[in-house]
Regions:
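Flexible, glycine-rich phosphate/dinucleotide-binding loops
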Residues: 19, 73, 222
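Alpha-helical cap/lid subdomain in secreted, periplasmic
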Residues: 92-270, 274-285
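Serine-esterase "nucleophile elbow" of acetyl-processing enzymes
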Residues: 2-69
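Short, solvent-exposed loop/turn and secondary-structure capping segments
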Residues: 21-25, 77-79, 119-123
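Glycine-rich, phosphate-binding/catalytic loops in enzymes
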Residues: 26-37, 83, 125-129, 232
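Catalytic-core regions of hydrolytic enzymes
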Residues: 69, 74-104, 193
């Protein structure tokens, strides 16, 4: 007989922040161009916010699913919820039972949208600097190897970047991207992120009208960059306001993430995850 459908009480949807990328006991590995996080769905870090929220709700790992997917954008998550899979140049994820699982969840948290600007920026940097090999140079940082950025890790990053042999033309293209291109990407992504989030809420509400849903807000992923020169500050502040209004419109909770402590790789520290868990649990109590 076919195995009974697993029923999770708490399902966490989102990107690498949800997955706990960068935490020492997160379970993930690169498989060619893609990440394999299947072992993380229930083997997630004890320090990630999903573990702490589950603990706060009195739930075990058997009752909790961490569906955090590295490099996932809001449109990808919408496709994943609608069809059970999503694939592009940088992602390849499949959760064929997701819709059925969502129907039975009591709590669903959604943290998505930061990659709507970060992934296009990475592609822009790769394009400006000569293509796919740029990702190979920067991947150790994205994978959490440089979270503390000590002397040896900085030297390794410098060696990786020096090996690219950037031409004057590529340097010019990169400077243009950094000067105005990032701000343009931020502006262009606002409407699509909100549209995808609204469609996602409609899907979740249709699948499970009784579930408690929490939209998790955004933080500045590059806090060391001063505010006047940091386009992310304005972008995520504006997006937070818009997403909070969207949450009110659809009668779901909103958990602010504005003061999340971040490591050098733009992912939360263990303390950052603890803060996010507190914010989510607080939102669920309202």
């Amino acid at each position: 007989a076919e195995a009974a459908q697993h029923q999770y009480s708490y399902i966490a949807l989102g990107d690498s922040i949800v997955a706990g990328i960068g935490l020492p006991d997160a379970v993930y590995q690169r498989n060619g161009r893609y990440y394999d996080v299947s072992g993380n769905y229930q083997g997630y870090s004890k320090d990630c916010y999903v573990a702490r929220v589950a603990e706060g709700l009195g739930l075990s790992r058997d009752q909790t699913a961490n569906y955090g997917m590295p490099a996932l954008m809001s449109g990808d998550l919408l496709e994943l919820v609608r069809t059970g899979s999503c694939q592009s140049a940088s992602i390849n994820f499949s959760l064929p039972d997701l819709r059925q699982e969502l129907k039975h969840a009591q709590v669903i948290t959604v943290e998505i949208g930061a990659n709507d600007v970060l992934v296009p920026i990475m592609y822009g940097i790769a394009s400006a600097m000569g293509g796919p090999q740029v990702f190979e140079a920067l991947l150790p940082m994205l994978e959490g190897d440089f979270r503390q950025m000590d002397a040896s890790s900085f030297a390794a990053l410098r060696e990786n970047l020096d090996s690219l042999n950037i031409t004057a033309q590529q340097r010019k293209a990169l400077l243009k991207l950094l000067d105005s291109g990032i701000a343009e990407i931020c502006t262009q992504s606002q409407a699509s992120t909100l549209a995808n989030l609204e469609a996602l809420l409609q899907e979740l509400k249709a699948l499970n009208p009784d579930a408690q849903i929490v939209l998790v807000g955004y933080y500045n992923p590059v806090p060391l960059l001063p505010a006047p020169a940091n386009p992310f500050v304005k972008h995520f502040r504006t997006l937070n306001r818009s997403v909070q209004k969207l949450a009110q419109q659809y009668d779901v909770a909103f958990a602010s993430a504005a003061y999340t402590l971040v490591a050098n790789d733009a992912h939360p520290t263990a303390c950052g995850h603890k803060y996010l868990a507190r914010q989510i649990l607080k939102a669920l109590e309202k």
